Amino acid sequence: MAGSQRLKRMADSVQRELSELIRQELKDPRLGGLVTISAVKVSADMGYAEVYVTVMGRELGDEQSEAANKETLDVLNKASGFLRHELSRRIKTRITPRLRFHYDKTNAYGNYMFGLIEKAVQDLPEQSSEDKS
């Protein structure tokens, strides 16, 4: 149980510090919109951290957005060495995990589903007050 608490604390620290680092230190114009870290999962040996990111303002299924998301991941994965080095300066641990970035589609998928529900509700025929009784 203590090990899982330690991993959770490490994941929280990595998420907090990486958010700041990406916002303040990465000046690559290919990053585009607001990059947010939705989750971090640290391996049991703390050797790796799976970092899940989202980019605000991009829709699911849009080909341009998919290409931009891939480019964002490429930029983040190429900067992972720099980010890891900076992370090691901010988080004082014996091991700083290697970073692997993944695009988190849950937020975009939720927005997509919400749009489908809204469209379905709008397409419903108007019910008169007689039908409701």
UniProtKB/Swiss-Prot annotation:
GO cellular component, alphabetical, reads: cytosol
Gene3D superfamilies the record matches: 3.30.300.20
Q: Where in the cell is it found?
A: Cytoplasm
Tell me, in one coarse class, where this protein mainly resides.
cytoplasm
- According to its UniProt entry, this protein's organism is Acinetobacter baylyi (strain ATCC 33305 / BD413 / ADP1)
Q: Which GO terms describe its biological process?
A: maturation of SSU-rRNA
Gene coding for it:
rbfA
Write down what this protein is called: Ribosome-binding factor A
MF annotations from Gene Ontology? ribosomal small subunit binding
Q: What does UniProt list as this organism's lineage?
A: Bacteria, Pseudomonadati, Pseudomonadota, Gammaproteobacteria, Moraxellales
Protein role: One of several proteins that assist in the late maturation steps of the functional core of the 30S ribosomal subunit. Associates with free 30S ribosomal subunits (but not with 30S subunits that are part of 70S ribosomes or polysomes). Required for efficient processing of 16S rRNA. May interact with the 5'-terminal helix region of 16S rRNA.
Q: Say which family it is in.
A: Belongs to the RbfA family.
